């Protein structure tokens, strides 16, 4: 572990890393140059309490996306102008050839945190992308400085409020990726499927009801509304307090043609104390060629990994669809690899923040 003034510590880390990579691999019968995996730079930013979890995450990610990992946090117990650094390297066999990758842990003093962007630029591998993930406890000063210099910004709107995410998003041109957006793909896909062969019904929506689990963490309804609103050209106009136990109107939007849309949010069973809140159901009230049409995509009470997909009125349908489950390593990998929804997510985040700010 090295600690001290920024320039001295970073110079020492760079020197030690260069020496490690330039020295031959002595684990083989005949010494040979080390083979370094350089698929990306992954920069994870969080609080001191999150460091161990971030380490575990980095190790799991390296199984498929080996490269250089930087774990960055802030510690007000350090000399304000200092930085503490530690690094390690791991080699694993891929056939006959050991593949090696490294990890650098950086803890900044309060004043030194302003230099985080230049430090990261100095320590990252220059010819591959810089992926920055802001963990829920990421200090604002670090996130604000790193967002403009990254090639991709990852966050989790199930843990971080949408207003903060939108604030950071406005400060970067980098593509955005959201763990929660990946987890809720199945719900969005099923909602969008209602309108595959009747797009005119999407323009006639006059009421939206969203059921979600109660809890202290960020409301997942905001991003779902942001996604729908940004796709359909809605303008959010008002938002009031939720109506306990019912589906009372808590907000209003204006459709692209100026027609009013009622928004109702329903509290479902509470999530656990530390659990993320989840979408439990979406109901849309619209019309098709002048006839009322009610659309529903709702989790089954006794099988919450399955949704019931229904149409009533102008059309009729009733199907069951699995929502699926993926572990968090898969979710993170998807945020890194899937590029097709970048613009869609940015627009959804900004619209969700506009709703939440009312």
What are these regions (language model features)?
Residues 68-78, 132-136, 157-160, 235-251:
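A generic structural motif
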Residues 83-94, 151-160, 252-275:
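Acidic, Ser/Thr-rich peripheral helices and adjacent loops at domain boundaries
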Residues 184-252:
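ATP/pyrophosphate-binding catalytic subdomain of soluble kinases
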Residues 5, 9-32, 36, 40, ...:
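C-terminal structured domains
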Residues 1-133:
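An N-terminal, globular interaction/scaffold subdomain
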Residues 102-106, 110-201:
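Conserved, well-structured core segments that form the ligand-binding/active-site neighborhood
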Residues 54-55, 116-117, 142-144, 218-222:
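A short acidic (Asp/Glu
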Residues 49, 111, 179, 212-216, ...:
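Conserved aromatic-histidine-acidic binding/catalytic patches
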């Amino acid at each position: 572990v090295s600690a001290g003034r920024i320039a001295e510590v970073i110079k020492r880390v760079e020197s030690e890393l260069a020496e490690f990579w330039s020295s031959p691999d002595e684990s083989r019968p005949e010494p040979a140059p080390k083979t370094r995996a350089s698929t990306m730079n992954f920069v994870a930013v969080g609080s001191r309490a999150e460091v161990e979890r971030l380490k575990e995450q980095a190790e799991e990610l390296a199984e498929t996306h080996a490269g250089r990992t930087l774990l960055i946090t802030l510690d007000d117990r350090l000399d304000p102008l200092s930085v503490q650094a530690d690094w390690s390297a791991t080699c694993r066999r891929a056939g006959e050839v050991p593949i090696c990758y490294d990890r650098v842990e950086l803890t900044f003093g309060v004043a030194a945190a302003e230099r985080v962007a230049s430090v990261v630029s100095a320590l990252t591998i220059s010819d591959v992308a810089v992926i920055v993930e802001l963990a829920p406890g990421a200090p604002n000063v670090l996130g604000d400085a790193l967002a403009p210099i990254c090639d991709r910004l990852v966050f989790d709107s199930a843990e971080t409020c949408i207003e903060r995410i939108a604030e950071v998003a406005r400060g970067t041109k980098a593509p955005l990726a959201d763990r929660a957006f990946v987890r809720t793909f199945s719900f969005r896909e099923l909602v969008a499927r209602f309108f595959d062969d009747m797009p005119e019904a999407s323009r006639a929506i006059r009421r939206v009801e969203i059921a979600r689990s109660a809890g202290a963490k960020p409301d997942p309804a905001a991003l779902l509304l942001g996604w729908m609103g940004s796709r359909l050209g809605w303008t959010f106009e008002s938002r009031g307090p939720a109506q306990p136990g019912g589906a009372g109107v808590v907000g209003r939007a204006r459709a692209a043609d100026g027609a009013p849309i009622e928004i109702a949010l329903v509290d479902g069973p509470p999530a656990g104390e530390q659990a993320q809140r989840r979408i439990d159901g979406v109901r849309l009230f619209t019309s098709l060629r002048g006839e009322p049409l009610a659309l529903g995509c709702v989790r089954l009470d006794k099988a919450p990994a399955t949704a019931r997909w229904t149409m009533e009125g102008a059309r009729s349908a009733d199907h069951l669809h699995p929502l699926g489950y993926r572990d968090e390593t898969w979710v993170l990998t998807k945020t890194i690899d899937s590029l097709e929804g970048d613009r869609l997510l940015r627009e959804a985040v900004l619209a969700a923040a506009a709703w939440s700010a009312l």
